[in-house]
A protein has these predicted regions:
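Alpha-helix capping at helix-to-loop junctions
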Residues: 94-101, 149, 196, 244
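Short acidic, glycine/tyrosine-flanked loop/strand segments centered on an H-E-D-like triad
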Residues: 57-68, 160-170, 212-214
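A short beta-strand-loop-alpha-helix capping motif that often carries His-Thr
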Residues: 106-113, 205-213
Length: 572
């Protein structure tokens, strides 16, 4: 089977929210309100299939931590945020994409509770462009600026508004990847290029989706990758799953029938469906990856309709249904030994809706066009139907945004920033990866101490932070000034930083510290004369310990070692 894959990257931008004046970390008052969302039709009057599926559940959505009226959908949106637009344009420049003259925002229907308005706003920024990875080129399809969704709360119906409205840059590539490892490499290259711009960092700030198809079949969108390391394995397993779906027998189905009279005890409304020649397919566990187990697949479809799951002939009798009841169902459906059946229970309306969805899925040949979520075992499970063009319609509350009014400078890439640093490759890479190169350049321009500054930023400050100390930029500059004046030595910088941060007096070197050092070493080597004669110059290492314990931070370690070696030689 031939793989064809493309990427969709969603990166949070480090600006204010997209259509209000709220900051990204602002939570506001703890306000609770409820909404029941309904799917709206597109310009052509069609309702998107994905929106229809969400609407079947008839949830009442609950949001809290409300931070402004725009994102409670109580007042019109403002904006868009100019800083967010600039960041998006910077990335467009980096990939040589063709930037649009005006941004026209659209509404994308979303009724799963993740947006209070029932839609997500998105605007096209640029088209085309390329990403280079591992000596290869991947073409981009388009770049869009959109608003992020709510976070899930503790309950399924509960959502938190702190993330709603955070600007997202959506990067969509063309389906040109034909190797699972290339999918990972391309995603990594895009992520690295994004970090040249002012984007958010940390867990959950970037999300990667992968579109996968085999043999030019239907596109399946994979969501929820935990990390880039799992990407090749997930894609490989998805290719196997789709390949097996193409090889699977076609299931011929009968009419769903009510089988309430097949049970000894009264149960909820029940429907059963016969599937010819599917015996063993619903509960198949033969493949090592667990694909394709159609019973689980159909159960996931039923859950989206509001049921808790399904039962099927490959696992019955079980779950309170005995052998006699199982045989009654088979008899009612007219099943033979090669046939299978599906059984569902629930409220009549929900059960009928669920059965319609199950029937539609069974009748779909090969691979259905759908969205699937990635599991911790690097497999995928059905999430929802693939949205279509019917979910889009124009945003009437936001005027077109003219890009010509913005002056945007193309940022340097991470590689370019590394080359600009007067350090070795490893130190330069660490500073850039930790977003410390800007601070380094500012300090180095003032003090011209590249090696020392690299050591302080990469090692000293993180170590002090781990010890619970908070060192400000002013503390660091104050100590560096004292170092350049020669009143503290390199080894004394960590202690001086702590003293400055605690508003304590910084202990500087005394004028006679060299005399004190010489007196101390003379006394020490006199006491250890026999030890020195026995060990020779090898005694220096052992004697450095007590000397450094007294003079660490007062004098340079190299100078201390030099004096000690001279005194040891005199003994020898």
């Amino acid at each position: 089977m031939t793989l064809k894959a493309g990427l969709e990257i969603h990166q949070q931008l480090n600006s204010g929210k997209l259509f209000c004046n709220c900051g990204l970390s602002e939570n506001g008052k703890d306000v609770q309100f409820k909404r029941k969302l309904h799917a709206t039709s597109s310009e052509l009057g069609d309702v998107d299939i994905a929106a229809k599926t969400e609407q079947i559940k008839l949830f009442t959505y609950y949001n809290k931590s409300c931070n402004c009226l725009v994102y409670t959908d109580e007042e019109p949106p403002r904006g868009p945020n100019a800083d967010a637009v600039k960041i998006a344009l910077q990335f467009a420049q980096l990939v040589n994409a063709k930037i649009v003259e005006e941004i026209h925002f659209m509404r994308k229907v979303v009724v799963d509770g993740s947006n209070t308005s029932g839609f997500q706003r998105t605007g096209l920024i640029a088209t085309g462009g390329i990403i280079e990875y591992d000596g290869k080129i991947l073409e981009l399809d388009q770049l869009c600026l959109e608003e992020d969704s709510c976070r899930h709360g503790e309950e399924d119906h509960e959502y938190l508004l702190d993330r709603l409205g955070v600007p997202l840059l959506e990067i969509t590539t063309k389906p040109q990847l034909d190797d699972s490892k290339d999918v990972q490499k391309a995603a990594k290259a895009i992520g690295r290029l994004l970090r040249a711009c002012n984007v958010k960092r940390g867990l959950g700030t970037i999300r990667q989706d992968v579109n996968v198809s085999v043999n030019n079949g239907q596109r399946v969108e994979l969501k929820g990758f935990q990390d880039l390391a799992s990407m090749p394995k997930v894609v490989e397993n998805e290719v196997k799953r789709q390949s097996r779906l193409y090889q699977m027998k076609e299931g011929k189905i009968g009419q769903p029938i009510n089988v309430d009279n097949c049970f000894k005890k009264k149960r909820e409304f029940s429907l059963a469906l016969k599937i010819e020649n599917w015996n063993g397919i619903l509960g198949n566990k033969d493949s090592p990856e667990g694909h394709v187990r159609m019973g689980r697949e159909l159960a996931d479809y039923a859950k989206r309709a509001g049921l808790k799951g399904i039962m099927h002939s490959d696992e019955l009798p079980a779950y309170g249904i005995d052998n006699e009841e199982t045989e009654n169902i088979k008899l009612s459906l007219g099943c033979n030994d090669n046939d299978a059946f599906i059984l569902i229970f629930g409220k009549e309306k929900i059960t009928k809706n669920a059965m319609e969805i199950i029937v539609e899925r069974i009748n779909t040949k090969g691979v259905p066009k759908e969205v699937r979520k990635v599991t911790p075992k690097n497999l995928t499970r059905y999430l929802r139907p693939m949205p279509g063009a019917s979910r889009m319609y124009p945003e009437t509350d936001i005027a077109p945004f003219k890009i010509a009014n913005l002056k945007v400078r193309k940022p340097k890439t991470l590689d370019e920033r590394e080359k600009d640093l007067p350090l070795n490759d490893e130190e330069s890479k660490q500073l850039v990866n930790n977003e410390l190169d800007k601070q380094f350049n500012i300090l180095n321009k003032k003090f011209d101490l590249p090696k020392l500054l690299s050591r302080i930023l990469l090692h000293t400050l993180p170590q002090l932070k781990n010890e619970g100390e908070t060192i400000s930029d002013s503390d660091l500059e104050k100590v560096l000034i004292l170092f350049q004046k020669g009143v503290i030595v390199k080894e004394g910088i960590p202690k001086a930083l702590v003293q400055s941060s605690r508003n304590e007096e910084i202990q500087v070197n005394s004028d006679n510290v060299e005399d004190e050092l010489e007196d101390f070493i003379v006394s020490l080597v006199s006491d250890k004369r026999e030890f020195i004669k026995e060990k020779g110059m090898g005694a220096v290492g052992a004697l450095m310990g007590p000397v450094m314990s007294k003079f660490r931070g007062k004098m340079d370690g190299g100078d201390i070692n030099k004096v000690l070696m001279e005194k040891v030689k005199e003994i020898l």
